[in-house]
Amino acid sequence: MPWQHRDLMNQRMEFALRALETENFRALCREYGISPRVGYKWRDRLLEEGMWRLSEKSRRPKTTPGALSEEEVCRIVALRVRHQHWGARKLQEIYRRAHGEAPSESSFKRVMERAGLVEKRRRRKASQGGKIGDDRRAGTPNEVWSIDFKGWWHDAQGRCEPLTVRDEWSRYLLEVRALENARMETVRTCFERLFERYGLPQAIRSDNGVPFSSSRALLGLSKLSAWWVALGIDLLRGRPAHPQDNGGHERMHKDIAREVEGTPYMDRQAALDVWKKEFNEERPHEAIGMKMPSEVYSPSARKWQGTPDQLDYEGLMSRRVKGTGYICFESQQIFLSTALHGWNVGLKPLDDGSLEVYFAKLLLGHLHPETASFTPLLQNSPQELEEAA
């Protein structure tokens, strides 16, 4: 006798009344298609509470320990409205810091969904992650700085294309600057200020665009990146047309697009400065244990001492690169790169009569005196002079 074919309330009353008289309780339960446990429950409820209590009881608990108060819900909604593009985990950390304890991450998600404060994202197809030429990843502050220009947009002040510089390990945003242009001199002045304030990094990660690189030059060196090499900074570059090689930096640019570019403001640099302060001092990051970048970043121990007049190649011959990109060796003019104009390079003789050509720690290639030619190194990999000696 399936339960669903008859009125549930009448069926329970009928069963309970018959259960008071039957001698074979289990057979009666089989007749009604229920377990003895359910049968005893309905019989006992009739005896203890009367026939009217045989109706279905709510399965909802009388108390819900995890239920949020109205005040907690309002706090969560206020946080989400203030930080419209932050996820539940970041908002939970901000809440905990402000109030000592915080509801669960799932509670944050539930409140935001019910308040209509969650935008559904289109699922992206998984992409094949690629390795860059030098796959070094930072393990301490200032081990690697990542840099790029945020894609431009137009505002009331004209074209805006901010330069962004970030410490890769701590996520600390060192600079987001709306420069007048992207010329080498302008960007170099900006980096001189950064080096003076934060010291020098061990390496700088960039894409292959101007002014960070020059696709047609020796090892992709531009005047700007040659200056970095002269300061003892290694160059890390992503593959052409592979922005995922600097993925963390690109994600930060998307945040700028949503939270600055897409909002009204009177002064672009003031708006960028406010966003930078929030990013560093208010926004927790999962990769650093939900801490703020300002809590884990510290300036570099390598202090900025200005640009050297010339580079020291102890024990090696040295030649200065002319404005045309040539060096003079044994009365022969040999072309290297105009990006090295004004710098001196080191020459180390080899047993076969050729010479290794170094720029700071970077092996550029081989000079062949007999043919007055130069063969550049195919891979841009820094090599210590002492290892080559």
Region locations from a protein language model:
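Short, amphipathic alpha-helical "recognition" segments used to contact nucleic acids or chromatin
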Residues: 6-23, 73-82
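Mobile genetic element proteins and their domesticated derivatives, centered on retroelements
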Residues: 15, 28-29, 39-42, 50, ...
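Basic, flexible linker segments flanking DNA-binding modules
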Residues: 51-144, 222, 292-302
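Mobile-element integrase/transposase regions
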Residues: 67, 71, 101-102, 106, ...
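Acidic/histidine-rich, metal-coordinating catalytic segments
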Residues: 195-218, 239-241, 246, 292-293
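Charged alpha-helix within mobile-element recombinases
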Residues: 224-305, 346, 350-351
